Each structure stands twice: as C-alpha cells, then as structure tokens.
C-alpha cells in the first residue's frame, strides 16, 4: 500500500484537487464548473511552465531557485524590445534566447565548476534580479502592444492561444520523459550519477540541458505574465521559485532526484493555484499564498520522508534471515 502511494503521486495530487473542488463547492455552489476549471488553468499557466522546467532540474538531483528572477528579467526584455519597435515574434525569440542563456550559465556553473546547485542559483537569483532592476531603473514597463495581450485572450472553450500551446507542450514533455531514451537519461542521471556515466549517459550534458530548458520555461512564463496583465512591475517573478518547487514536490518529484513525472508537477501547480482561488472565494488576504505554499512544501517533504522510512523498514524486515527474526522475537 505504501509503495502504491509512493509510485502514484499523480493520483494523490488529483484526489487533492477534487477534494478541494468539493470543499469550495460547498461554500459556493457555482464553483464546481467548467468555467472555474478554465479560469484556474489560465491562472496556473505561469506556474505550470515553471514546474515543467523545475521537473527536469529536480529529476537530475539539482535545484534552481533563480527561475523567478529569470522570468522577471525575461519579461523585462520582452517589454523593452516591444517598446523599442521590435515585432512580437522577434521579441519572443530574444526573450527565449535570454532565458536559455541564463539557464545555461546555471548549468555550466553546476556541472563544469562543480558548485552546488543551491549555491549557484542563489547567486544568480540576485544577479538576474539586480540586472532586471538596473535595466528598468526600478520602474514599471507599460504601454505593451495589444498583439501581446491577445495571446492570453480567451479563444475556443474559453482557453487562450497560449493555453492551447501549453497543453501541446505538456503532452510533448510527458511523452519525451516517459517514452524516449533521451527522457529516461534525466531519471538515470538523478537516480545514480556514477552508474549512468558507466552506462554511457553524458550526465554533464543532461544536467546542462535541464537547466537550459528550465531557463526557456522561465522565459515563456515571463512572456505569459506580460501577456496576461499587460504591463511589467519591477518585482515580476519574485517568489515564484518556491511555488514552482512546491508544485513539483506536491506532484511527486523527489528532491533526491530520479523520481516523478511532469504530469504530477503540473497537477501540483494546478492545486496551488486552486488554493489561491479559494483564498479569493474566502476573501482572505493575498499574503496567505506564500504561507500556504511553504506549509504545503514542508508537509509534503515530511510525508515523503516518513513514507520512505516506512518502506525501507518494511523492505529490511522482508530481507532479514529467518534466524535473525526468531532471535528478535525471543529477545
């Protein structure tokens, strides 16, 4: 039973989502509807993108706490390039390239210079955030063109063009990780680094790719942010890194690497966003968001630790010789 829970964390996250829907529907009978699902999905798009990127990094037994700053910096570059007269496709391309470069720098520092990921990304968190503020002089970027805002305008089934593209991206990432050798290399790298190297996996390249894709996802999150609200505040992306990590852990991505699925991380992101909508429904202040995200992260980590210890204890008892078991009983 315990192994079933450990190996099917996506189902656990889905049950949590349905239970929360049920609870909030008791408070407001109109809450449980297709319109609510699409609204929560729209609000969750930024966190989902960050969770996809964080999944790859965490699968390789690393962590990136700079994604919020990368998303903010990329949103600023997006806004500045549009206001400078560049068209939307060119601005998006520049933004994605910047995100990839920022992620590549993180990956290179971790793999080539052997600096721990948490230390590296704490440093680049401040670096990218400071660069963002230097570029904007601490001011907001406004007057973004309508063509950018149309990317987040509801289209078919009340889902925006970005929403449909995101669903295609989710399916593609899930297929790559589950069905391809390239995707399984991320699991192998995080599960047993030395063993993966002996099997011929280019673990350094895999880790750099994970960080680079994470940067691209953060850049996409920055584009979505700018598209949804139509301007770019000077604190864009602040605090998103913790929520992305919490979403992944909630969805079954292990901080020890090599375990979890991108679908689980996305369900975790949806659940955290759903909590936000619940706070609005209950008319609670917005600053409860970070408290709840931190609480959920700690609770899931404690649960994971206790679950892992229980499974290891059961396995040890099963593998214990009969004579040893009898000796324990006699004592």
UniProtKB/Swiss-Prot annotation:
One of its GO terms (cellular component) is plasma membrane. It comes from Photorhabdus luminescens. The chain crosses the membrane at residues 14-34, 39-59, 70-90, 93-113, 115-135, 157-177, 206-226, 252-272, 284-304. The gene is lsrC. Belongs to the binding-protein-dependent transport system permease family. AraH/RbsC subfamily. NCBIfam families: PRK15432.1. This is Autoinducer 2 import system permease protein LsrC. It is found in: Cell inner membrane. It is a multi-pass membrane protein. It comes from the Bacteria. The complex is composed of two ATP-binding proteins (LsrA), two transmembrane proteins (LsrC and LsrD) and a solute-binding protein (LsrB). Keywords: Cell inner membrane, Cell membrane, Membrane, Transmembrane, Transmembrane helix, Transport. Part of the ABC transporter complex LsrABCD involved in autoinducer 2 (AI-2) import. Probably responsible for the translocation of the substrate across the membrane.
């Amino acid at each position: 039973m315990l192994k079933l829970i450990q190996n099917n964390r996506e189902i656990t996250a889905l049950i949590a989502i349905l239970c929360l829907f049920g609870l909030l529907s008791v408070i407001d009978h109109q809450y449980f509807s297709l319109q609510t699902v699409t609204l929560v999905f729209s609000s969750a798009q930024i966190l989902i993108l960050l969770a996809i990127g964080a999944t790859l990094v965490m699968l390789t037994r690393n962590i990136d706490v700079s994604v919020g700053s990368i998303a903010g910096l990329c949103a600023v570059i997006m806004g500045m390039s549009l206001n400078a007269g560049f068209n939307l496709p060119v601005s998006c391309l520049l933004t994605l390239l910047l995100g990839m470069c920022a992620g590549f720098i993180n990956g290179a520092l971790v793999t080539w210079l052997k600096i721990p990921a948490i230390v590296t990304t704490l440093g680049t968190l401040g670096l990218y955030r400071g660069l963002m503020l230097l570029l904007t002089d601490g001011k907001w970027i406004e007057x973004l063109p309508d063509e950018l805002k149309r990317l987040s305008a509801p289209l078919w089934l009340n889902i925006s063009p970005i929403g449909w593209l995101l669903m295609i991206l989710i399916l593609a990432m899930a297929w790559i990780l589950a069905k391809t050798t390239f995707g399984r290399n991320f699991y192998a790298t995080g599960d047993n680094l030395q063993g993966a190297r002996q099997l011929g996996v280019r673990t350094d390249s895999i880790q750099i790719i994970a960080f680079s894709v994470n940067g691209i996802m953060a850049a996409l999150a920055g584009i979505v942010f700018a598209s949804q609200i139509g301007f770019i505040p000077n604190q864009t992306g602040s605090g998103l890194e913790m929520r992305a990590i919490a979403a992944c852990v909630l969805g079954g991505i292990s901080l020890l690497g090599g375990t979890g699925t991108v679908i689980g991380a996305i369900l975790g992101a949806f659940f955290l966003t759903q909590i936000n909508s619940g706070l609005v429904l209950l008319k609670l202040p917005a600053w409860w968001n970070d408290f709840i995200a931190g609480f959920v992260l700690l609770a899931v980590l404690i649960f994971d630790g206790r679950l892992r210890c229980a499974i290891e204890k059961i396995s040890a008892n099963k593998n214990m010789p009969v004579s040893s078991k009898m000796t324990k009983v006699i004592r």
